[in-house]
Structures are given as C-alpha cells and as structure tokens.
Amino acid sequence: MAEDWLDCPALGPGWKRREVFRKSGATCGRSDTYYQSPTGDRIRSKVELTRYLGPACDLTLFDFKQGILCYPAPKAHPVAVASKKRKKPSRPAKTRKRQVGPQSGEVRKEAPRDETKADTDTAPASFPAPGCCENCGISFSGDGTQRQRLKTLCKDCRAQRIAFNREQRMFKRVGCGECAACQVTEDCGACSTCLLQLPHDVASGLFCKCERRRCLRIVERSRGCGVCRGCQTQEDCGHCPICLRPPRPGLRRQWKCVQRRCLRGKHARRKGGCDSKMAARRRPGAQPLPPPPPSQSPEPTEPHPRALAPSPPAEFIYYCVDEDELQPYTNRRQNRKCGACAACLRRMDCGRCDFCCDKPKFGGSNQKRQKCRWRQCLQFAMKRLLPSVWSESEDGAGSPPPYRRRKRPSSARRHHLGPTLKPTLATRTAQPDHTQAPTKQEAGGGFVLPPPGTDLVFLREGASSPVQVPGPVAASTEALLQEAQCSGLSWVVALPQVKQEKADTQDEWTPGTAVLTSPVLVPGCPSKAVDPGLPSVKQEPPDPEEDKEENKDDSASKLAPEEEAGGAGTPVITEIFSLGGTRFRDTAVWLPRSKDLKKPGARKQ
C-alpha cells in the first residue's frame, strides 16, 4: 500500500489512514498504521483511538490494521468437537460420503454443513446446560462458551449490565450534566486531586476530577458478599472513625462505616501485610460478638478491632487511595493529610528541621525519610512528627527552629600537644560550679590544657625569656582566669598565689627576694591590669649565662620583625609536671629550643 493518506469510511467522513513500511532495523518490512481525524489530530494505536472517540463509539469490531469492521463468524467449534466424539461408533456421515463418492465438490461441502446443523439441533436435547442467573434468579440454558471469570447472567441481565457499565463510564469521564456536582465549574483546591494537580484532560486517560465536581450519579461497586453481618447492616454505628470524622463542606463521604463493611473476602484478596496477630483474630472458630461498652476493653474477636473504640483525630490515619485501605495497619504506604490545614497547604520546605536536613537535596543522608515537620498535617499526622514535639524547648513555634547538630563523642577527641600553636586559640572560661570536676580545658581546635596542679610555661618565640605559671596549691581554691589578647592570639593566665622563677625584665637584680608591685608583662603582647588584691610574687635574679642567651635571642628576633609579627609569634604551651619549686635553669632539659628560631632563613624555606 502506498504511503499516502487514504479515506477511511468505517470511522466516518473526514477520517484518513496511512500505512508506513519500516525500511531499516530488525523489524524491516513491517508496517505501522496511522489515522488522521477531521481536525488534523494523528493517532497511532487503537488505545489512543478509543480514548479520542470516547465511550460513545464502540470499536470492538474495528480492525485497526486494515481499517474495516470485521464481523466474527458464529463459533460452534466446542460443540462440533463433542459431536465427533459422540458419533464415532455409528459414523453415519462417512457412509453417506462413500455412497455419493464420484460427485462434484459442491455436494462434498454441503455434507459437513448438514452434519453441523444436525449436531447443533441434537446437542441441547441430549446435553442440556441449564444455568441460574445470578441477578434475577431465573434458570436458562447456557451455550457453554462463556469464560469462567464472568458472572452467570441471562441475556437480558447481561445486556442491562453492559448498558449500565457504559453509562457509568460516561458519568466518570464527562458527567451527567444535571446533578449539583456537574453544575460546579471551579475546583475546590482542598481535595487530594487538586493538591496533587492531576490532569483533567479526557484524552490523557486518567480522568481525575475534583471530588466536589464528581458526578453524583456514579454508583460505586459494592464489594461485599451480601450474607455477612457487615453487608446486612443498614445503619451507621456512629462511633467508628469514619462516622466521627468531621465532614468537609461540599464533599461527600467516600468510605463506608466500619460496621457495614464485608467481613468475608477482604483479606483473601490481599497479597501481603498480614501478621500473626491478625491471623489469630481471624480464626474460623471465633464468632463475632457485639461490641463491648467503652469501659471494658477485652481483646476483640472481629477482624476490625478499630471499630470497637474510636481513636482521637490526631492518631487517626487518613487514607485517600481506596476503600479497602481503611483496614488494620499493613506494610503499604499511607497518606496522612487532610488537605485543608495550614501545614497541608504549605508548599515549601523549611530547610532547617531535622527531617529537611536529612533529605538529599539539603545534603542529608536520607535515613529518616519524612517530609518537613512544618508540612505535617495538623489533623491526621502522628503527634511525634509535629514540630511542637521537636521544638518543645523553644520559646514559640512560630518559625522553624535552627537545626541542632549532634556533638562528637568525647572518645573521638584525642588531642596532642605540638611544638607550635595555631594562630587562634578559643578557650572556654571555667565555671565556678565545677571546682572539683577533673579537668581538661580545650584550647582551640586541637590542644588541651593540663589539669590543675601542674605548671605551665609560656614560650614566646624570639622573646627574652619564658614565663612559668604553676597551678594552685589546693584543689579547692578557684583559679581566676583572665584573657590576654594579642594579635591573632588569646591565651589564659592563672592568677592565684604564684612563685615565678624568672621574669623578663631588663632591670638589675639584687640578691635576695624582691616583691613586684607591677603586673608581669610578656613582650609583644598587651596585658591587662592585675588585681591589686592578689598576694605578692617572689622573684629571683637571673644568671649571667642566661643573660647571654637572651641577648642572642633578641638579636635573632630583630632580624625578622615581620615573621615575629605573623604566624611565627605564636606561643608554645608545654606541660611541666612535678617541678615542685625547682629553679627554671635546672629544668632546661624539659624545654629544648629549636634551631629554627635562631635562624630566620630556615623558617622562610
């Protein structure tokens, strides 16, 4: 067939079809059929054609490949097979053929037709197939060609069922146009269909309408057996979650009362989601009992335990998928939202709660897998998911609280003392409540101050001499901490009663002891005034050998002033244990001085 548009009168005037052959690929030689409507829309499958024409046009007999209507021949194949088995011993047809052997082919063709007619006439008389209509209850003789999954209906009832189904499909897609729901022209914006923004186009095949605009003539199929107590109950109980649920204006209730639901066949259709407790409640020997009063709480024997005692609205799980979903909890997904509260109408995530920080789009590990706390439904969500539970310590829940990160465990913090400190040291002030607690104070990101009772030596690179600050004498005395801020440096000086072995001053010393009346100054760092109420500090004169070393250090520091003002000017904290009042010159082995300090060129390399 040529690849041009040809008229297709089977679909009506203006319809055209075209057959295109494939010229390459694994399916080379096969053809594809396309149809074009009078409005210019192109259709390439029978499914699209059915959606386009709607339920008014029946395409059961339409051959999409050829573009014609194919009327099936009468099917009598099963009856003919039965007649052959029945006519084997007598074989009257073959004797007739032998008698009329040398005749024309027309007579040979007429013989099987006469045989089949005789078989169809004798089959109902010899093997009647009576049946009972499931709808009206009358008995009729069936032909035995129907499939087992279809209901046994007489011809009149089957025709009524087909017409009813066709009408219901039209009501679901288009509507009747007469009821109050069909007269509504605007969506409510609160139902699940409006919130999910599902397509309303009929050609899409979804036909998702707003719940307020759904035709009232749509009849939902009753999935009950009609025999059990739930199917025979005609009135609502008034105390189940469905009956207690507040109605939404303009919307009708789509779920049955729990007491009116069928008790048979519900769990047999489920593929999973059944645990041992529910299996024990559905034992065949258990008989349904009337619901006990609210004061008593025995274990229910019915398969619907939630029907006996109503649950509060906050703990009620709202389902908007199917009628069967309002059963005891299974492992299937549920949707807990009303669609009308402020949380359900919120579109954006806060980005600061723990659920948002867990999402991959905010850099989380996707472990909790919950939506934003500020978008949890205020009516149907579980209480543990609401933001009020998460931010109880906050003053108010008006805005999303900041995200609190978990602190690292103390075992993972292993700090080692190095030869130099980082440029910035963040020290924590000691609280007076924890005087007896043990204790290592953190200094910056990777250093630890020693516990009380030990001596500290602060070395200033390039300075004239170090300053030694021993710990307090008694554990009960509280050390007053005072910050001394330098350029890019913050360190701690303890100011209890101190014995200083050596001070960096250029004055001449006299033998004996001297009492300082001015605060101790460290070169290169501004110091704060010392409390005048503190006790006096004893000092001893330096040795001449140490003065020579100090002069060398001063000359080395003058060669590189820029380096001393930068990162090289950071102090070195070294722990000296159990000095016990020893002179500082005797402990020179504890403080080895690096050669890099004396040679500024080595540091630059």
Curated annotation (Swiss-Prot):
Zn(2+) 5 binds at residues 338, 341, 344, 377. Residues 80-123, 269-308, 391-451, 520-573 are annotated as: Disordered. Changing residue 22 to A/K: Abolishes binding to methylated DNA. One of its GO terms (molecular function) is methyl-CpG binding. Keywords: Chromosome, DNA-binding, Isopeptide bond, Metal-binding, Nucleus, Phosphoprotein, Repeat, Transcription, Transcription regulation, Ubl conjugation, Zinc, Zinc-finger. Residues 1-69 form the MBD domain. GO terms for biological process: DNA methylation-dependent constitutive heterochromatin formation; negative regulation of DNA-templated transcription; negative regulation of transcription by RNA polymerase II; transcription by RNA polymerase II. InterPro entries: DNA-bd_dom_sf, Methyl_CpG_DNA-bd, Znf_CXXC. It is found in: Nucleus; Nucleus matrix; Nucleus speckle; Chromosome. A motif (Nuclear localization signal) lies at residues 84-88. Zn(2+) 4 binds at residues 237, 240, 243, 257. Zn(2+) 3 binds at residues 225, 228, 231, 262. There is a cross-link at residues 117, 277, 422, 440, 499, 538, 558 (Glycyl lysine isopeptide (Lys-Gly) (interchain with G-Cter in SUMO2)). Residues 529-592 are annotated as: Transcriptional repression domain (TRD). A zinc finger (CXXC-type) spans 169-216, 217-263, 330-378. Zn(2+) 6 binds at residues 350, 353, 356, 372. The modification Phosphoserine is found at residues 297, 391, 399. Widely expressed. Induction: Up-regulated by interferon. Residues 287-297 have a biased composition (Pro residues). Transcriptional repressor that binds CpG islands in promoters where the DNA is methylated at position 5 of cytosine within CpG dinucleotides. Binding is abolished by the presence of 7-mG that is produced by DNA damage by methylmethanesulfonate (MMS). Acts as transcriptional repressor and plays a role in gene silencing by recruiting ATF7IP, which in turn recruits factors such as the histone methyltransferase SETDB1. Probably forms a complex with SETDB1 and ATF7IP that represses transcription and couples DNA methylation and histone 'Lys-9' trimethylation. Interacts with OASL, ATF7IP, ATF7IP2 and BAHD1. Binds CHAF1A and the SUV39H1-CBX5 complex via the MBD domain. Binds MGP via the TRD domain. May be part of the MeCP1 complex. PANTHER family: METHYL-CPG BINDING PROTEIN, MBD, METHYL-CPG-BINDING DOMAIN PROTEIN 1. The methyl-CpG-binding domain (MBD) functions both in binding to methylated DNA and in protein interactions. The third CXXC-type zinc finger mediates binding to DNA containing unmethylated CpG dinucleotides. This is Methyl-CpG-binding domain protein 1. It comes from Homo sapiens (Human).
